[in-house]
Regions:
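Terminal, low-structured helical/coil segments at or just beyond the last alpha-helical repeat
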Residues: 2-22, 132, 136-163
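Alpha-helical segment of the N-proximal tetratricopeptide repeat
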Residues: 18-51, 57, 68
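Helix-start (N-cap) detector for alpha-helical repeat units in TPR-like alpha-solenoids
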Residues: 22-23, 56-57, 90-91, 124-125, ...
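Structural signature of tandem alpha-helical TPR/SEL1-like repeats
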Residues: 5, 34-47, 68-81, 88, ...
Length: 163
């Protein structure tokens, strides 16, 4: 007879078909990332991409994990792969810009944020990130205007978060 824990673990075991699904490995990577297991998340995203190399969210999310580990060249490569598949992918554009900004490449970062905003003018996170890049470039008035737009898009909550 199974204990409740053994029974639960059997129910949670993925089927063979799930194990062959890129979507399964993407979700596994997301779960691992959300639980702070970055290295394991990267492995899961790699597995997903081995099954389906066109899975944009796996490229983007892997890039985010790599950026959080300060592995910036690898992160940029992931965002580039996502953008090869969908050049106007707003999250990949903004995330690429954030990595460039972390490397103090503010002019390049600004171009990414502008492209993300061109893809979705209501993307508050890109406006916020653009404001930071503009400020770093010494363009204070433009930075204030971008920040005001970000705050307006966030619904007047008074604070914006990177997205």
């Amino acid at each position: 007879m199974f204990s409740p824990i053994q029974a639960f673990s059997v129910l949670m075991m993925p089927s063979a078909s799930e194990m062959q699904s890129a979507g399964f490995w993407l979700e596994k990577g997301n779960d691992l990332c959300n639980s702070g297991q970055g290295q394991e998340a990267i492995k899961a995203y790699d597995h997903a991409l081995g099954i389906d190399g066109t899975l944009i969210d796996a490229w983007n999310n892997k890039g985010l994990v790599l950026a959080s580990l300060e592995r910036f060249p690898e992160a940029l490569q992931c965002f580039e792969e996502a953008l090869k598949l969908t050049p106007s992918h707003k999250q990949a554009l903004s995330n690429k810009g954030m990595v460039l900004a972390q490397q103090k490449k503010y002019a390049e970062a600004l171009g990414c944020f502008e492209a993300a905003i061109a893809a979705d003018a209501y993307f508050a996170g890109a406006w916020y990130n653009m404001a930071l890049a503009l400020q770093c470039l010494g363009r204070g008035k433009e930075a204030m205007a971008a920040m005001k737009t970000a705050e307006t898009l966030e619904g007047g909550r008074g604070s914006c978060c990177r997205r």
